[in-house]
Amino acid sequence: MTVTVDEIVQLRVGGLPVETARDLASPGALEWAERVLGARARVAELREGASDQLAGHVRGAPDGLRKELVQIRRAVFNGRRADRAIAALPTGLAEVVAAVVEPVRRAEAELAELEAAGRTSFPDWLVGERRRLASLLEDEDFSDGLAVAVPGAGRSLRAYPRKGVVAVPNKQMRKCERSLMSYAMRAAAKASPFSTFTPTALTSFTAGAPGWERLPSRPRRHSRWSIYPVARALGGLREDRRRLQGLPLRLSRTVQPRSDGGLDVVRSVYEYKDSDRGEDYATCEQSVVRLRQSEVCRIVTDLLGEGTLVFETVVAGLAERAGLTRERAGEALARLVRLGLVEVDGLDLHPHTAHRAGTARRILCAAGDDDAAGLARALDRYEESASAVGGTTGAERERAVARVRDAVEDLYEIAGLQARPPRTVVYEDCALGRGVYRGPALRWSEEECRALGVLATLLDPAQTDRALMRGYFVQSVGEGGRCADVPGFLRSFDADLYDSHKTRTLDPRAATSEDPWLRWGEAWRWEEARRALTSLIEAGEDELDLLPVLTGDSELLRGLDLPRYRYRHLFLFAQVLPEGSAGSLVVNRIFGHAGFGLSRFAYMHGPEGARVARDQEERARLSGVRLAEVSGGAAFTNLNLHGPLLGTEIIQPGDPGGSSAPTRMDLDGLVLEDRPGESRLALVAPDGEEVQPAYLGYLVLSATPLPTQLLALLAPASNVTTSFVPDLPEGSGPRTLPRVRIGSLVVRRRTVQVPTALLPEPDPATPEGYPEWVRWWRDAGLPERCYVSLAGRDGMPPGKPRYLEVSGLVNLAASSHEWRGQDGWLNVSEALPDLSETVINREDDHRIHEMVLGFDLTNPVTEGAVS
């Protein structure tokens, strides 16, 4: 097996200096809180000691004094004054008792003085942090990013320096503050994508060390519309017969005749649901529509059998042949459009051309209908207004974003949609050119890369599905067999096995080897291996190295039939660590699909951006493999927008039109074959060349249509997921998960899990509440600087981590507001690397960065299977 690291890597650079995180903290407040806690502990210790001494006097006192001494003892222990009671004691005894109590009183006085000093200083600490937070609005890049990320909040943000920089802001300013703090931490301490907060850049590795010529001081900006409103407006046309006038129709590409004369249509419908958060998200609802044999279906399929016809032409033909009125024929045809047998040609958006609405505008203009023409003009206004945002700044940018939102509202109104625009109506990407990179050199070994490949396969839940598919193939076609009807095989696999399997919930306590579904292809072995790995990483105490169990004939891998791919490319998001640190690099969690590493921002970097994919394509060709893109279905989110990065695309039934790939292969023309020596299935072209599907979008595969998900099972796992943090069992107390590594590669930071039910009640932004939070933080063993994510009991994955320093009063208050009342737990991870350890230095401006690293694992055909 050969390892080849990509020559070009992507950097995601922080949008604010790392010093910002330290500026938004108050070390003096933390020092004061710790002194208060120390003083309180000292007082408690002295009270207990004094109580023990007074107990001796109580035992030896005559009956007439015992009651008074008991009351004095209780008062001292509970922190109440007892001066009068002590003075009333007999001479001699009063002096003895006073001497016992005096150290307690001195310590209590010191504590009271310390607490009073904190109450005096606390408003200054809060105002100081808020003043520094407000000063970030003077950073043009950050402020402009907020205008796009938080549209409509401009007035509140502008008011924050005047109304929010106080000891106790009002409710509106606190809400504004929480949003501002969230984006400040995201920009300064975590290279989060998709905004002006974190521009991207390209660099290359030469002889193992990164080289970068010159980093410009300002990023290039490019704004474009969100295609979510576009897809929603165009998708709504099929629901209204009146809006079908003049539009071209075609038969669905997923129609399958049945033996009884009826038709089956695999229909994919995107459901757009408004949410309080204004998320631009849709779910792909897939179903098989079974149409019985009917005269109307026969006539329509005959009419559209030769190609596309406009709606009125099909209505006229149907009315004439079926003896229907035009009205009834139109209703019948509109119903077939809704059922999916007939589709509007050219209105579905392909990732290659969706940024220009594909062919939709041309089709709408050619329809000859006033509503269609009005919709085309609305699309023009939306695109023009969104494109203009990138060239604006300050107050003009706020007005520009407002105009974009107005354009979306007009678009929805013209399309007849009763819906609210999403929160994000314009996307802005920023890029830096090549520059001087002064980060640490890359120091990983080939053995570690190979182990990462094994881990990626082991952790990928789809590996169980790959085993199921191969088991089904061997059973239905035969071991080493070939199947020429690939779409038919995928449909049968889904109908007979996969669909039922995916709707089940596995009992984590049951023996997987006895599960009848998991016996196909011995898929149960992968489930068992994942369980064993989970047990292994949960059992470790301080640090766990997985390298020995991911190489050789380890017990964990024994019995697994690891697939051998002739060419395989993996992505990981990582931060390189300096010499002498905890390792060579830290692998970060990937939110989404790693194909975005070479697609999402490629257009911002010109020919070099496309070279990342072209280099992979050439290396795959040398290994006898052709990489071929799969579209991921109709585009409805900017997460999947990209130009044609590979030379070939596989066209599946139901794919959107608009592909710009130079070469297009119909899935119908490929062959699926079993390769027992490589323990996998492979797609093969007619000339014998292996074709490896490559989904290049960022949207997670589970959100794409089922055909894409099934086809992706014929490709290897393409990223190294680091979801090593298991759920905290319900009813459990805090627990610490060890740091996990593969040799020098850290794949999980040391993490403490704490139930939200144990969070302190007081407000940390008060002198009374903050020491309680510091005490709780220390008692729970949480690091002073950390990344915190909230996980719930709702089955959803944990949210994105947020950088937090316990000395940051405002940040802690904003975070605790998010955690309060949630049923779940916090994942508190060590801040590795420290913010000062992995930075880009630019004219005394230090920025955190994250690398999108890629590498190949290739197996020559002559080698034996890896196991």
PLM segments and residue spans:
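Acidic, low-complexity/disordered tracts enriched in E/D and polar residues
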Residues: 1-6, 10, 183-305, 424
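Segments forming glycine/polar-rich beta-alpha architectures that bind adenosine-containing cofactors
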Residues: 233-236, 243-258, 466-480, 664-667, ...
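Histidine-dependent nucleotide/RNA phosphoesterase domain, centered on the 2H-phosphoesterase fold
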Residues: 303-309, 341-344
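Short acidic, hydrophobic short linear motifs in intrinsically disordered regions
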Residues: 307-320
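C-terminal structured domains
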Residues: 580-838, 843-860
